Amino acid sequence: MGGRRGPNRTSYCRNPLCEPGSSGGSGGGHTSSASVTSVRSRTRSSSGTGLSSPPLATQTVVPLQHCKIPELPVQASILFELQLFFCQLIALFVHYINIYKTVWWYPPSHPPSHTSLNFHLIDFNLLMVTTIVLGRRFIGSIVKEASQRGKVTLFRSILLFLTRFTVLTATGWSLCRSLIHLFRTYSFLNLLFLCYPFGMYIPFLQLNCDLRKTNLFSHVASMGPREAVSGLARSRDYLLTLRETWKQHTKQLYGPDAMPTHACCLSPSLIRSEVEFLKMDFNWRMKEVLVSAMLSAYYVAFVPVWFVKNTHYYDKRWSCELFLLVSISTSVILMQHLLPASYCDLLHKAAAHLGCWQKVDPALCSNVLQHPWTEECMWPQGVLVKHSKNVYKAVGHYNVAIPSDVSHFRFHFFFSKPLRILNILLLLEGAVIVYQLYSLMSSDKWHQTISLALILFSNYYAFFKLLRDRLVLGKAYSYSANSQRDLDHRFS
């Protein structure tokens, strides 16, 4: 019977599931090479609520067998940046059509126009600055490829130096010339609107984890009034922050070239450390996606409109719609590049090793054995543990996550299923394409028809690559799931 424990009632011993350090050690290779030794313990009789602690006398943590996914082709960084730059130029071109379109087909009695655009109204210096900002990633990839270090011939080294010098000189000269003209032509408010995103760049991409490791800000915060640093030292700290932020940004700029690795180990502390590193890396990639997408949409949709004369008419609704289309399309393309199939599989492996805990009502398991949670143990599936005055049930094959850590729960939720990110991107890109097709069929304006038709081509290519990866990986993971089910049945 349930109820409160009286003074004469026998108290069961609650031994930990495993001794500290029994699950340590790391194993390389593709699968976990050892399993955690099961520990015998007593269980109470169930209270009839459906919750029960499994018999641990014969339980063994089943070793994970990771799926071997095929090597999918990964686009080279410079080719991807060229493709992204081309898509952004198309979006910028169709927006200029929306703003500066003419009625060239009208009869001569109306104001004559021999071209489809009012080219005399376009500020080509503003167009040059916008193009350079949109092509910053492509320019950076060219400079990176031309800055390769290694054993190269004299002719190749001279060619790479000339390429790097030409690209940087042409970009710098064009940017300085256009900015000088803009400073002479427009007001300070217009220039502030033009440069506003770059002022928000450093605060958004601030190095939270790396700065805590280097104790850059904690050292300044711990100083007393008499130990205040000088202005030069503060400027050096800011320059160090700027340099480290730019270093991390350029590292994430070429995602597939700097892919982290997975250590298939059985040490709980090492697994949690690996998950923390992967969380930081994933957050950096998502920040890069968000910043690049918003920056592209801002300079494609908002900047050309801001510098238009007040007497000039344009379709404001279409400009806002173009902002959403460019931001979503750019986000999907960047996520497809920065989160390839191998990276998503890496996150899935780490989530499988981490495990997850489900919070249960203590009243429903008052007569079920509850082990005190310890961080040195790997807990098998179905075990109840007590942590921070709450009761949790193990969900994964084996679990080393901290039960009260919400970030561990989120990590396991997003990456426990390896195709979840790919499915989200596929649905998002498919929804954008369906909306564009609907807008194309219902549009009665020639400039919108041309704009939607051109933007659709870039989305078609991204959707094709996502669908190809989804079909191939779906077959691979379904075969692995059947094999894992047979292995679990053999162990049980």
Curated annotation (Swiss-Prot):
Single GO cellular component term: membrane
Pfam name, any one: Tmp39
Glycosylation site positions: 8
InterPro entries: Uncharacterised_TMEM39 (IPR019397)
Bias-annotated ranges (Low complexity): 31-54
Region annotated Disordered, chain positions: 1-54
Compartments, record wording: Endoplasmic reticulum membrane
Keyword tags: Endoplasmic reticulum, Glycoprotein, Membrane, Transmembrane, Transmembrane helix
Topology term for the membrane: Multi-pass membrane protein
Ranges that cross the membrane: 77-97, 115-135, 153-175, 185-205, 288-308, 322-342, 421-441, 447-467
Similarity remark: Belongs to the TMEM39 family.
Annotated function: May protect the cells against DNA damage caused by exposure to the cold-warming stress and facilitates tissue damage repair during the recovery phase.
Protein known as: Transmembrane protein 39B
Organism listed in the record: Bos taurus
Lineage of origin: Eukaryota, Metazoa, Chordata, Craniata, Vertebrata
